[in-house]
Regions:
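Short, polar/acidic, helix-capping and beta-turn segments at strand->helix junctions
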Residues: 1-127
Length: 127
C-alpha cells in the first residue's frame, strides 16, 4: 500500500508530529484543519473560519491528487453551537451537490482560543 505524507503550513505539524494529509492507497485522510492563515491572525467569524479551513483542505486534496468531488466524509468541530448555521452555509457552498457524509459536533475548546471551527475530511482517489 502506498503511504504518502502531504505537509501543510501549520506550525503545529512539526511540534505534534502529524501531516496535513496522508494518502494511504486510494484514500486521502485530511487531519483536523484549523483556520490558520499563512500569515496573520485567523478570521473572526465562523463563516470565514470555515471557508479558510476548507481552502486549506482543498490545497491538501490538490497536492494529494484529489478534489472536493472526491470527498466522502467531513467532520466539523465547533466551539459554539450557535455557529452551525454559518459553518454549515460555508460547507454547503463548497460541497454543493457533492454532499459527503458529514458530522458536526460542538466541543468545549480547540487548541487556540481564537479558533471557532476545525474540519477533517476523507476522500477516495478516482482510478
Amino acid at each position: 500500500m502506498e503511504r504518502r505524507l502531504i505537509p501543510g503550513h501549520s506550525p503545529y505539524e512539526a511540534v505534534v508530529g502529524f501531516s496535513r494529509a496522508v494518502v494511504a492507497g486510494d484514500r486521502v485522510h485530511v487531519a483536523g484543519t484549523a483556520p490558520i492563515p499563512v500569515e496573520g491572525d485567523p478570521p473572526e467569524g465562523a463563516y470565514d473560519q470555515t471557508r479558510l479551513c476548507l481552502e486549506i483542505i482543498g490545497g491538501a486534496l490538490e497536492r494529494a491528487g484529489a478534489t472536493f468531488a472526491d470527498v466522502v466524509r467531513t467532520r466539523t468541530y465547533l466551539t459554539e453551537a450557535e455557529d452551525w448555521p454559518e459553518a454549515g452555509r460555508a460547507h454547503g457552498e463548497v460541497f454543493g451537490e457533492i454532499r459527503p457524509a458529514s458530522t458536526c459536533v460542538v466541543v468545549k475548546a480547540l487548541v487556540d482560543p481564537r479558533f471557532r471551527v476545525e474540519i477533517e475530511a476523507e476522500a477516495v482517489l478516482s482510478p
